[in-house]
Amino acid sequence: MQKLESRGVILFNRNYRENDKLVKIFTKQAGKRMFFVRGGGSGKLSAVIQPLNIAEFMMTVNDEGLSFIEDYSQAESFKEITSDIFKLSYATYLAALTDAAIADGVVDAELFAFLEKTLVLMEEGLDYEILTNIFEIQVLDRFGVRLNFHECVFCHRVGLPFDFSYKFSGLLCPNHYEEDERRSHLDPNVPYLLDRFQGLSFEELRSISVKDEMKRKLRQFIDELYDNYVGIHLKSKKFIDNLNSWGHIMSKEDNAD
């Protein structure tokens, strides 16, 4: 047991017993922890423990069992995100993906900063779909998946119209397409963008602009990567997929009018 003060982001909360809450917080100093909040629905902590809120938490952290929030300060919420069902759905997925990417108790200040900054940029109005793609690609290594989208796996040449090979877990240049007859047949812009996404800085994020058709191609291929290399199936991701389908149907109906 230790007393600790740390910045943290609420990943989720759920009811526990009749009036209490269990709250998963990703903290900068102590990693992900599950906290017990007595009277969570009506106590002084009720506002701050809502998903995606960020604050400085004064905590009692236990290595085994539940931890406890003693107090908090500097609470921040993302009003633009929580008022938009699409942004909220994508942000919720990022929180769930973060929860899946590292074990509880593992300190990962870099991932914490990346999640926080991604949420801030989403709140500021940057493209939430592309921000999500970038997050998905950069968090792959937390699942033990390290893919090189920069060069051909055979000749290491760069800057060519590459395709992806699951057989070799990497890119093929035109001279080596024949090495895998079941290569992905991607639009070459997909691996080009994924290469950029892997090393993109936060400031560069502001200049990224991707057309809808390319977004669909990115979404399809990243889904395939996660199916083949990660194998997780998050409810929040399924909700996004359904939401996008509904959105496309609504868009078609609006155009028909």
Curated annotation (Swiss-Prot):
From the record, what ranges are coiled-coil? Answer: none
Taxonomic superkingdom: Bacteria
**Mind naming one GO cellular-component term on file for this protein?**
bacterial nucleoid
Could you list this entry's UniProt keywords, alphabetically sorted: DNA damage, DNA recombination, DNA repair
InterPro entries assigned to the protein according to its UniProt record, in alphabetical order: ARFGAP/RecO, DNA_rep/recomb_RecO_N, NA-bd_OB-fold, RecO, RecO_C
Alphabetical list of Pfam families matching this protein = RecO_C, RecO_N
Q: Which SUPFAM superfamilies would you find in this protein's record? A: ArfGap/RecO-like zinc finger (SSF57863), Nucleic acid-binding proteins (SSF50249)
State the family it belongs to.
Answer: Belongs to the RecO family.
Its annotated function is as follows: Involved in DNA repair and RecF pathway recombination.
What name has this protein been given in UniProt?
DNA repair protein RecO
Species of origin reads Streptococcus thermophilus (strain ATCC BAA-491 / LMD-9)
| Gene label | recO
